[in-house]
Structures are given as structure tokens and as C-alpha cells.
Amino acid sequence: MKKIYSILFLLSLTGLFGQPPRSLNTDLEFVFEHPLLLHRLDSLSLNIGEEASVLIRLVDSKGNQVKTTFMIRGQRKAIVAEPRRSDTTGVAKVTVKALDSGELNLRAMAIGKKGRTVGALKVNVPLVPLEKITFVAPIQKVFVGTSVNYSVKVFDKAKRIRRNTNVVFTSSNNKVAEFDNFGNLTINKTGKTTITATVDDIDESLVVSAKKNPARKIKFDISENQVRTGDVIKLNATVLDGRDKVLDNIPITFSYSGQAIHQTDNFINNRSTESVGLPASGLITQNGKFVAETPGIYTLTAQSSGFSASKKVKVVPRNVRKRLEVVGHGTISNVNTSDLWVWPGVGKHKGKDFAVTGTHSADGEAYFWDISDPANMEIIDTIKVDARTVNDVKISEDGRVGVISREGASNRKNGLVILDVTDPFNVSIINEYNDDLTGGVHNVFIYEDHIYALSAGRRYDIINISDPANPFRVGSYELNSPGHSIHDVWVENGIAYSSNWSDGVHVVDVGGIKQSEKSRAKNQFNPFLALAGKGSPGNPIKLGSKEDPNGHNHAAFPFQSESTNKFYIITGDEWAKAVPGSPERIFQGGFHFVDFTDVKNPVETAIYQVPEVGSHNHWVKGDTLFAGYYYGGIRVVDISGELMGNLYAQGREIAFFKGEDPNGTTPNITNVWGVIPYKGLIYFADLNNGLWAVRLVDNAPLGTN
């Protein structure tokens, strides 16, 4: 066993606001005080743009100050708090700035061996008066017999978009055109009307001209007559005039109806043998696409100008179900397991296979495994460092250099440790790198002689390890948005994909080789490579991004669909609902499929979400998603074809498995952290019980009683 240090202390708080549930330590509490008067604050009132200072102390039940560091966070994109970490005396003088209105929170959190201590100060920020309304891409020429939707943006005097306002739409001449309650304007007759959007005491108006409708019929066809659940159908509809001329400016609406069937029913003469109580469920879009969630006979309808046309489609079960069979399991019962990595041996160990797993809220250990015989995997070496948590572990492409992250070091030097893993039976420490990383390194990645390391949840630093014994920083990437925070970074083909909570995914050129669109291989084209070529590890250049409206962006993985000419980034959530009166939290969230085929206009088209559990990390191989789902175990999902709607409801889940172990740190409960497909098997790390290897096998035929 190799050691750097052995003294253990409180866990660094870099990633605490997104960690697994643990017990509350009620022996300690946070006190929020006025920095000059030193009286206790029950709340704080600020206007947008204003700042105030708050003194935060961590004390025991007798009011004595506890000398340890803790983390401070403002509500994302609403409150900025600086600094984000206290000093070692257990005190922080924090400058708080309000960016949004509402009943907000300034939060503090510390983690110790007895559990976590949390505290919050209410920050009340009043609403700013509204200033203006603007129509979004308004249509001013409309046609009788059609319906047009209007939307607006509402701005306040702080120049911010105000959401969740009650905007009322009215028409000055309802005989010409009339609004419903949802911003849809129905055109009744030719003429002019002034439409007005009103909220509170401000409004905006627009003159709309209603013209005679030249439409005389609608032509409608669909791309397929029989599909599986989850397959996207293209709806081809055109409006024609009396001379069969196509009218491009006449709106078309699409709808569906249908009858669901049992998964095992047979179709007879295009009718199911028995209907069920389930609805014929699916998703239809107004740009002409449909996908079904349940098998059945569906009627798809295109309507415009009083004309309609329909087509029927048969939807059959997707039938991708398999099962996961255990190949091997290495139990870790004394500490919690964090992430994993697997790789092929090199040199004298060529032909063998190895894995490394980290540890969470433990003693700073990383375990190295021989998995050459997956059924008999075993720990062959251990590295121990000064840390409570070794959250992340990575191995270089050539299988010779490893890196492990550190959080909770006793000397507050929470950097990273560089390892020689050429001989996994005798792993040695090459060096450690702590420069400006003392706030804790939560996640790391190795790509082409560089380590990408998260620094205190603020940015990722890029560290050259061409000589692993002498690492040095060459660059960094940090967002400039207020209160920004980062959780993870992944690098592939010289493009870095970082996950930044509410700021979403950022795509950065760190050495991508520029690729010509003309020379691209069909179905294997990353459009960001067409933009790359100017960035490097020392000069990272942003290529694109997409915000996360829910603020839960925890991980990201690029996905070049093998079955379509589309490029997605699959972003993963991590968030949890508090249970009133309990230290436990209910994890929620899933994986969002963002179509970046047009890098300037990314669109989320699909989601995979298991209703009762929450997501963690994921991996893609081919057209298959492998997902770690905390208490939901490991999930394997078919992501072939165009992706749209609710993938879970569409029957795309191939298999799931819960690795329950009576000898785990929490007996008989799974808590899957990370997952990697490798050489026909699927390896995953379970927080509660160690390392697993499973494989997909066909479902056994059902017998009879």
C-alpha cells in the first residue's frame, strides 16, 4: 500500500450540494450575523443589483466556533456569494449580491464524520417593475379559416426577461379574428384587427391583416405504415389551391387518435384482438413528426383551412428487452465506492484487463483490480492519499498514467495525484499537483498528455503531463456567468464537453482537428469538428453551448448516432428533493438528448427518465446508452434511430439490474455510480458494495404453470 499522508479530516465541499444522502449532524449549526453589529440575522432584504455582507460561523451546541472549512452557495443565477468557501477557522465573511427576485436562500454546508450540517439564510428580493413587452416573430398576414399562435417576451426595468407572467391577448375586432386563452388567434373573416398583449399596466400592439384563403385541399402522406414504438414517422402535408399549386404560407396542424393494445396482442385485419385501458399515447409535433409510446392503431390527421386528410399507422411493440446476467462481483464492504475506469494492460501485462475504483467519504483510497477473469475479479493493489474522498479515477489512453482526484485533505491541499499504472500490481505515485486546486478536485479527465481537472467547482484547469513527474498548468476554462459552477468535463477528439448546472453544457475546442464537411463519413460526423482547429489546451475556444433551464446539468456525453445523420449531446441530471423532517433526499432526473446537428440552434428532442429514481453518470457505445441510476441500478437503453419524446415510455429500455449485496456498506440496496461497457461486458461501480461485471443475454422464454 502506498501513502502520501494518513491524517484524515473533514471532507472538502466542492461537490457537496450534489452528493448522495447521508445523516444530519445536529450537534453543529450555522449562524448568520451582521458583520459589524454581530447580531444574528433571520433574513436579509436586497433589491436586484444590491450587495450586502454577511458573517457566517459554524458553531457547536454551546456556541463555540468549530474550526473547519465549509462551502457557501447562493441560489443559482439568483444570488452570487463570494467567497464560496470559508477559511480554516470556520468563519466566512461573504458578499451577497441579488440577481433575481423572489424568496431566495444563501446556503452553507459542511461534512464531517457525524454527517452533514446545513444552514440557510432567507434573502428576500422584491420584484422589479415591468418595462416592456415584445412579440416574438409575429405573423401579420393571416388567412381566413386558420389559427396562428402568438408569443411574447416580457422585460422588467432591470432588462431581464420576466417569466411566469399572466399575459392577456385581445383582438380589437373579434368578428375578424379572436383569441383563446392560450395565445391562439382564430381567423374568422377578411379584414384588419389590432392584437394587443397586456400584462399589468404595460402592453404592445400589432396590426394583423386577414386575407381570403386560397386553399382548396390538403395533400397528406406518411413515411411509414408500420413502425415500432419509439420510431419517428415523418408527416408530409401540403396545402394546395384550386390549380394544385402548393401554398407554403398556410399553417397546418397535426393531431392523432388511436386504440392501444396489449403488448402480446395480435393484429387481425389491422385491428387488435383486445383493447386496454391504456391510452393510445404518443407525441406529435407541429413541424410534422409523430412517435408512439404504446402499440396500437393510430389515425394521424393533417388539418388546414377547413380541410383535413388522415392516414392510419400500425404501431407494434419495440421488443428490445433482454436481461443482465452477473459475470462477477468484487464486494467492498468497509467503505463507499465512487467512480471506476477499466483498461487493457500494457507491456508485460498485455492481454490482461484491469480496473480502478475510488472511494467516497472514506480514507482516501483507490483500489486496483485484475479483471482478466471477470468472474474472479480481485483487488491487486491499493493507493492511499491524504483525502476523505477519491471521487474520480482516470487512466491515460496508453494505459501507463493514472490520475485520482482528492477532496477533504487534512492539510487542505485538495489537488490531484498522478500515478504510474504500467504495472497495476505495483502502482506507484509519480507526483501530486495542488497548485491553485486547494478547494478540491471533484472530477478529472486525461486526454493526450493533459489532465482536465475541476478546480473548486469553478472552472477546469488543463495540466500538461507529457512528463508526469513535472506537471504544469497550460490553460483553464471558466464561465463568466454570475454564480457559475461546474461539475464535470469529458474530452473526445480534442473537444471538451463540460457540465455546468444551470449554465448547461459548454463545448470547447482544446485541440480538435478541423474536419471538412465534404470529406465527412456519413453518419459519423461531429459538426463541432468542422468549427475546430484554432483551439488548444493552452488556448481553449468555446464552440457552442446550451443552458439547462432546470439547473441540473451534471454530466454530458457526445453521441454520433450510427443509424441517423444526427449529432446529440446527452446531458445528465443530478438533483434531489428534500424529505421534510428527514436527512434523506429523493433523487430525481434523467438524460436529455440535445440535437446539436445545427450547432447554432441546439434543440432538446428526447428524454430518458425513470420516474421513481434519479440519474448519475452515463456512457454511450454504438446506439446504446448505459446509465448509472443510483437506487435504480444500471439501465441499458436503445437509442437507435431519430430520438423524440419519452424514451422510457416508448419501451426503449433494454434491461436493468440492481446489484444488491447483503455485505455492502448499506446491505441489500443498490446505488450505482458509474458504468463502462468493455469487451462485451458492462462494468459498474456501486456506492454501497463495490465493482460488478454483467452482460446482456436474451430473455429466457416464458414457461407455463
Label each PLM-derived region with a short phrase.
Residues 5-8, 80, 196, 514:
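Residues marking helix boundaries in flexible regions
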Residues 5-6, 159, 207, 464, ...:
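Intrinsically disordered, low-complexity segments enriched in glycine/proline and serine/threonine
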Residues 15-16, 169, 254, 699, ...:
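Residues in and immediately flanking transmembrane alpha helices
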